[in-house]
Amino acid sequence: MSMGTFLTDKKVKIRVNGSVPGEDIDFNEGAAVTSNDSTFSGVFRWRFGEKWSVAGQYWDSSDSSFVTLTEDIGWEDYTLKAGSNIGAGVELTVARVFFGRSFHTGARHEFGLGAGLHWLEFGAFIEGEFFINDESTGFRREAVSADAPLPNIGGWYWYAFSPRWMLTTRVDWLGITVGDYSGSLWNANAAINFQAWRHVGLGLSYQYFALDVDIEKSDWNGGADLTYRGPFISLNVNW
């Protein structure tokens, strides 16, 4: 089990279509949502039987800000004008469960494949003075949200340099249409782990999560392009 801090560098673009398809809104630049964040992250793995295991992961990220627009932004059939002050925010929660089987193990290495499920909750909002056909509709807050279970396949490889040092890598992938969602998902990690004591170790890894999805729901017709990446510093406990 690992617990620690995920130092994310995030890039967020969303699209909310109106009567005609819209353009992506860059929340890092146009809405000035910060690209850097730190959040708690937890990972666990339990081996049952000689070759089977189940793993899990959880982390979330949220941020909001206020900014003066430098260009017009379109949201459904509404427009927020350049020069106006707006508030904006995004949040993402990721929970992952993965069942795997080891196919090749040795004294110093292990390789396995499996399948899992990501549960994602994503939301975004913009608030300010909205216009439609150049006429003000007044101050309002518009928000979209989506949550979905997305299945995936993946694999991992571990290599122990010595009794105390180990390299671990894993990757999950999804490219499929599921209900109202279609697109791709990548969730990858590469880590160096040091076993400082018998049951306690330290880890430094690089985490990469990317979701590019089109959404066709009654309350959100559009899409999202999300990338969260950065180091994960952890305390590892094993028994």
Please name every model-derived segment.
Residues 1-17, 27-62, 98, 182-190:
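Transmembrane beta-barrel domains of bacterial outer-membrane proteins
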Residues 3, 42-46, 97-101, 115-117, ...:
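Residues on the lipid-exposed face of transmembrane beta-strands in outer-membrane beta-barrel proteins
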Residues 3-7, 56-60, 113-119, 157, ...:
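Transmembrane beta-barrel strands of outer-membrane/channel proteins
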Residues 11-38, 60-93, 120-148, 176-181, ...:
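Extracellular/periplasm-exposed beta-strand and loop segments of Gram-negative cell-envelope proteins
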Residues 51-54, 109, 163-167, 198-202:
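Repeated loop/turn-to-beta-strand initiation elements of outer-membrane beta-barrel proteins
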Residues 92-98, 105, 110:
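Ordered, amphipathic secondary-structure segments that act as subunit-interaction surfaces
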Residues 150-171:
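A contiguous binding-surface segment within folded domains or other stable secondary-structure elements
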Residues 166-179, 183:
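Transmembrane beta-strand segments that form the barrel wall of outer-membrane beta-barrel proteins
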